[in-house]
Amino acid sequence: MKPKILFIMHMPPPVHGASMVGQFIHDSELVNSSFDCHYVNLSVATRLEDVGKGGWHKAKGVLKKLMEVRKAVKSVKPDLVYITPNSAGVPFYKDFMTVMMLKMMGQKVVMHFHNKGVETRQDKWLDNWMYKRYFKDVKLILLADALYEDVKKYVKREDVFVCPNAIPAISNANQVTENSDHVPHILWLTNIMKTKGIMEYLSALKILEDKGMKFQADFVGGLTKEMSGDEFDSALSMMGLNECCTYYGPKYGDDKYSFFSQADVFVLPSYTEAFPVSILEAMQFALPVVASNVGGVSAEVEDGVNGFLLGGKQPVMLNTFRPDAHEIADKILLLLSNPNLRYNMGKAGREKFEKEFTLEVFEKRMVEILSNNVKC
């Protein structure tokens, strides 16, 4: 008889990194053939702009989700519960209730973190009290070795497993070409948020334009409560970037992949990240990456090999990092000015993706980790 696992995880909608990985697990033939799998969608928000928000409607949704989880545990009687909780803020308080309920019901719990933030809250007396109970007698799956720094106060290293994110292979994504005869495209493919470094990035583009560089900056992603469409348009106008910048809104599937196909450089100057899937997508399409050295990004981008890391060699875990516009501009300028460098870095990124970040590699790692935890 196969071990029974109850997966409590985020799945679309809305679409974000954690929900995409949740969908991959849900659809995995290897995972579903290895275990007797049962699923509960942990998501309460159905729209991206509602993620992280509170309110009475959200509170009712949380209580309803708790009852759904409780019912599933009593019905399935799993050998292991896999959950993808949050690490800080209001979402953490919600997930704290779920994890503590699972423990009270005598469940063996594995927590898979797609975010970070414990270190930013561990000095708060309430959060510290909750973390001590949250992390007691559980196993953790982290996205990168560097992210252990975020939880080391509460979790022993031997209780931690590492399983990086992955994405499905796209058949037409391996076309690495040396093309220097067109205006290069710089791709931003994430939500339009100040915490993604949007203002610093626009300042960097202004620096490049003032230097006389020719480029087209493509923006693909949803607007959020951090920055409205009017605010974004106003920022472009104020910096005089309307001619070289185009906003396309959120894109999915083949529409999204077409932007990767026509891009020359991928940029993600975030204040904070865990292990962004968008970088893996860029690597698959053989794009050199310019990204902040935060969270587990250094496991994806090797500085000077398949891209450039912003902010120094040491990964930043705290949410205090701010990218420097001049550093962003310098790295992009180096890539725009050197097609051979773009080609070689993109090729290295593609090779790294094929070796470490395909869905097949992820599925095998996940099955191995879950099997080990069912037995222990």
Task: Name the predicted role of every residue range.
Residues 250-251, 258-263:
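Short alpha-helical donor nucleotide-sugar binding micro-motif in glycosyltransferases
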Residues 230-251:
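Nucleotide-activated donor-binding/catalytic signature segment of Leloir-type glycosyltransferases, i.e.
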Residues 271:
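Aromatic "clamp/platform" in nucleotide-sugar-dependent glycosyltransferases that forms part
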Residues 132-174:
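Donor nucleotide-sugar binding/catalytic pocket of nucleotide-sugar-dependent glycosyltransferases
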